[in-house]
């Protein structure tokens, strides 16, 4: 709710009405396409985990593997960071795999995904560092420092929150160190399956980014956003998700603040952020809800 409060602080009532009108005008075909791509990413994530389970000597049910991913994200929307525990428990109970090993494989997945996101971040910086630096050092930003003090304050708050979040995870990282090692072992045991695992990991991120990119075309006013800004804005959104329940509130705000540095109006950035977040949230709630209902039935019948 803190980030919703910040959003209300940086927008006027007229701007909020404008954002809502933009969202209502979104073309449904692009929204459906974005939701489908987001769902594909989560489905592929479930399929990818099966390679890790086989690497440690366990077979897993495909529906359970995929359903656990949606359940994970649904849980995160209710209780931050609870999803991994829910997913590990589901995979352990329904596939008859020791929970320590499921934690290990999930930790391995996390490390792979973080590595990919950091790689994309570095790539964005190398390809567009001149544009990024120019946007923050041109006359519109630093020369009007007094007018941008609120923006600077909010960016500082986001950075502090990220630092606090990272520090809070240090102890948990120590606790799950053995599980992470187990996960690494599952990666090394992939052997000839490693190329397929890498391809699936790449497809996950391609789908996520494509969903973010497609939603830009759903509202005519979003055309003002240069395509070269979409990838860095996507990465900003990715790193902001961990700051609240599945990125609620902070995801659109982070994207808006980033685009504001490039002269994109706040209402445009928030429209893009809320549309992208909502598409993924709807998919998560629908398929997550179905998974919470269907998976226990499958387990009972099994």
Walk through the language-model features, giving the residues of each.
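Membrane-embedded alpha-helical segments of transport systems
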Residues: 71-79, 103-126, 275-286
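Extracellular/periplasmic helix-loop-helix junctions in multi-pass membrane proteins
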Residues: 219-230, 250-274
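Re-entrant/interfacial helical elements at transmembrane boundaries that shape
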Residues: 84-93, 245-261
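Juxtamembrane/transmembrane-helix interface segments of polytopic membrane transporters
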Residues: 121-129, 256, 260, 292
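Membrane-interface alpha-helices at helix entry/exit sites of multi-pass transporters
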Residues: 62-65, 82-84, 97-110, 265-275
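Hydrophobic, aromatic-rich membrane-embedded alpha-helical segments
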Residues: 66-93
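Transmembrane alpha-helix interface/packing and boundary motifs in multi-pass membrane proteins
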Residues: 71-80, 232-252
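Predominantly cytoplasmic-facing regulatory/coupling regions of multi-pass membrane proteins
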Residues: 1-69, 127, 131-241, 264, ...
């Amino acid at each position: 709710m803190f980030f919703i409060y910040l959003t209300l602080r940086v927008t006027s009532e007229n701007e909020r009405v404008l954002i809502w009108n933009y969202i209502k005008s979104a073309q449904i075909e692009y929204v459906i396409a974005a939701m489908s791509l987001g769902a594909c990413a989560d489905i592929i994530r479930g399929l990818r985990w099966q390679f890790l389970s086989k690497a440690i000597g366990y077979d897993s049910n495909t529906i359970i593997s995929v359903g656990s991913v949606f359940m994970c994200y649904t849980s995160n929307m209710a209780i931050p960071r609870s999803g991994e525990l829910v997913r590990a428990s589901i995979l352990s109970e329904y596939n008859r795999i020791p929970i320590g090993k499921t934690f290990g494989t999930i930790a391995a997945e996390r490390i792979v995904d973080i590595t990919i996101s950091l790689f994309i971040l570095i790539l964005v910086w190398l390809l567009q560092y001149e544009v990024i630096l120019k946007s923050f050092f041109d006359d519109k930003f630093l020369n009007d420092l007094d007018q941008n003090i609120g923006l600077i304050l909010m960016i500082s708050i986001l950075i502090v929150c990220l630092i606090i979040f990272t520090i809070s995870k240090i102890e948990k990282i120590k606790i799950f160190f053995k599980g992470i090692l187990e996960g690494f072992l599952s990666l090394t045991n992939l052997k000839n399956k490693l190329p397929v695992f890498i391809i699936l990991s790449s497809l996950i991120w391609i789908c996520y980014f494509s969903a973010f990119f497609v939603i830009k075309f759903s509202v005519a006013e979003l055309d003002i956003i240069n395509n070269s800004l979409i990838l860095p804005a996507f990465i900003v959104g990715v790193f902001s998700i961990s700051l609240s329940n599945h990125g609620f509130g902070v995801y659109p705000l982070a994207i808006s603040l980033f685009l504001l540095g490039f002269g994109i109006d706040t209402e445009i950035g928030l429209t893009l952020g809320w549309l992208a977040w909502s598409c993924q949230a709807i998919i998560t709630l629908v398929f997550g809800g179905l998974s919470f209902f269907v998976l226990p039935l499958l387990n009972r019948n099994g």
